[in-house]
Amino acid sequence: MKAEGGDHSMINLSVQQVLSLWAHGTVLRNLTEMWYWIFLWALFSSLFVHGAAGVLMFVMLQRHRQGRVISVIAVSIGFLASVTGAMITSAAVAGIYRVAGKNMAPLEALVWGVGQTVLTLIISFSRILATL
């Protein structure tokens, strides 16, 4: 896939490139490219967190009559909600970078993507603790 505007550099849209930070030394110039890299980091970090929480819930509720079903439903809804939020915030961050005329390094996309998951965790725990 070619980049927009006369620039003949390739857009890095491979999941393997994103997760391995293979494009070392390159910069992300396109809005699509920035959004995709940030979103994939948010997606996979959220998948890791929700997977760990799901395993913990499944183990702790294995003797409960409906515990397995509750675990799957709770983790699925939580994951879908966080991925939906990650889509929107990744687009917002990429849009701000694009409007500002800045390029993004692949490591910055990692920080923004994983940072979204960390902020989601902090907000989620603070909301739970407030209800106790």
Curated annotation (Swiss-Prot):
Topology in the lipid bilayer: Multi-pass membrane protein
Record keywords, A-Z: Cell membrane, Glycoprotein, Membrane, Transmembrane, Transmembrane helix, Wnt signaling pathway
GO cellular component: plasma membrane
GO biological process, one term: negative regulation of canonical Wnt signaling pathway
Transmembrane regions: 38-58, 69-89, 105-125
Taxonomic superkingdom: Eukaryota
A Pfam entry, by short name: Tmemb_170
Segments on the Cytoplasmic face: 59-68, 126-132
Expression by tissue: Expressed in normal breast tissues. Down-regulated in breast cancer cells (at protein level).
Subcellular location as annotated: Cell membrane
Residue positions the entry lists as glycosylated: 12
Extracellular side: 1-37, 90-104
Cross-referenced InterPro entries: Transmembrane_pr_170
Keyword flag Transmembrane: yes
Similarity field: Belongs to the TMEM170 family.
Subunit field text: Interacts with CTNNB1.
Task performed by this protein: Negatively regulates the canonical Wnt signaling in breast cancer cells. Exerts an inhibitory effect on breast cancer growth by inhibiting CTNNB1 stabilization and nucleus translocation, which reduces the activity of Wnt targets.
Protein name according to UniProt: Transmembrane protein 170B
Annotated organism of origin: Homo sapiens
